Each structure stands twice: as C-alpha cells, then as structure tokens.
Design a protein with these regions (language model features):
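Acidic, surface-exposed loops and disordered segments
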Residues: 1-173
C-alpha cells in the first residue's frame, strides 16, 4: 500500500489530457473507491455514471459550453473519461456526500497513475434541457442532480503544485 500523504500531495487538477483511454478496470477501481466514501446518515443515495467514450464526453461538454456560455473550445480539458457523481434531488447531504466521494475518486486516480480534474459545470447546467437529455441518455437517473464530475485520463502536460496558504489552522486546547 502506498503512503497516503504522498498520494494526497501528488494529486493535481490537470487541464491537459492525452486522448488515450485508461484501462476500464482502473476506471472501475476509481469508482469503487468513490463508493466507499462516507455518506451522511449512511444513505448512499448517489449514482456514478462513467462516460468511457471521448466522443460522448465531448458531446456533453459542447452542451455544457452552450448552456454556460463557455465557448466552443470548452471540452472537459480533452479527457477521454468523465465520471459523473449525481445524487437524489432535494437530499440534504448531496453536496457533502458527493464531495467526499469525489475526493476518494481523485485520490484513487492518482494512486493508479492517472490524472484528474474536478469539474463543477455540470452541477450548474444539469437541468438545462439539452444537457439533461444527454445525462439521461448516458445513465444519470432522472430524479438526480449532478453534484460534480471528474475528468480522468493520462497527463498531456505536467501541472506543478500550487503553494499552500499559511495560517489556515487554529488549534484550541
């Protein structure tokens, strides 16, 4: 087993991916890690939708770009895989549960030698009719909202670590 702190410190948000698809078994390991995240009150009302097809991912990115006025160049950074975390609509813990699952997902991708980028635009556009139609076609349940998604793949261009801020911790004894 790897050193967890090393994995945490080496994780980056990558915005330049190679077009090569990672092995499907690695993607399923990533999803399994997400499934093991904690969930408020043990509800586990999330759903993971894997878009293991660069063309379909690009089609969704184009719909998001149109809905969010991002321009024609928006493409989920060219990642060949996109994993969507959705949650039952109107559930109190959806955002924090989804965030916990996403962190597990991102760390497992790093552990497996893949890179990732957390993407929020689907949360903001999931109910735009053109976007919702694709989400439904790809397997996101109708009664779910998108919490977040992750672009997954191999790195095209190295991403240096950003400096961390100081003074963000208070300890009371």
């Amino acid at each position: 087993m790897s050193n967890l702190m090393e994995v945490i410190k080496s994780r980056r948000s990558t915005r330049a991916f190679k077009s090569e698809l990672p092995p499907k078994d690695q993607i399923m390991q990533i999803v399994e890690a997400a499934e093991w995240a904690p969930s408020g009150m043990g509800k586990y009302l999330w759903h993971f939708t894997v878009i293991y097809n660069a063309e379909k991912s690009l089609k969704l990115a184009r719909a998001v770009a149109e809905a969010d006025n991002r321009g024609p160049q928006y493409n989920f950074y060219g990642a060949p895989v996109n994993i969507i975390i959705s949650y039952k609509r109107d559930e109190h813990h959806a955002l924090v549960d989804g965030a916990a699952a996403m962190e597990n997902l991102l760390l497992m991708a790093t552990e497996l030698g893949l890179v990732s980028c957390w993407i929020n635009q689907l949360r903001e556009t999931c109910d735009v009719p053109e976007v919702r139609a694709l989400l439904t076609e790809y397997g996101v349940p109708e009664d779910h909202i998108v919490v977040c998604s992750a672009a997954i793949g191999y790195i095209e261009k190295e991403t240096p670590a950003k400096p961390r801020h100081e003074g963000l911790v208070s300890i009371t004894e």
